[in-house]
Amino acid sequence: AYALTRAENAGVAARVLTPSCGQEPFENELSVLLREQEIDLILLAGFTVILSAEFTKQWPRRILNVHPSLIPAFCGKGMYGLRVHEAALARGVKVTGATVHFVNEIPDGGEILLQKAVEIAPDDTPETLQRRVMEQAEWQVLPLAAERVCAEIVREKEQKND
């Protein structure tokens, strides 16, 4: 993934964990790593693993996901990647977009932070729509939402230190 190249170029440590060893061992290893590194915010982009309630409850309001639709449309278990855009086109909707939400135990069911709409063109394919939603919505709302939540985290830490 290009994120690993970016991390290396920026001198940021990176680790790759895969859920191939099973959900529980994956989540346990991830939790240990996040705590060791004192991570305050987890961003999910293109992450297709559904995290367990046990994991998400350890990180309340600290996991953000970007989903390629305007939730509650075209979301939930099994709705990711091109499937979302195929469903939007099959349904004939005129507008789709992206949603950033907090992650909880319900797939795509957490509190919505930001949404951005993208019009669907008559000649769109799932691939062209996916690209436009990424460029016009996902890549814009995820950094904005992360910035807002980071500011909230900083305020909380400052209040604890006062």
What name fits each language-model region?
Residues A1-D162:
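One-carbon transfer enzymes
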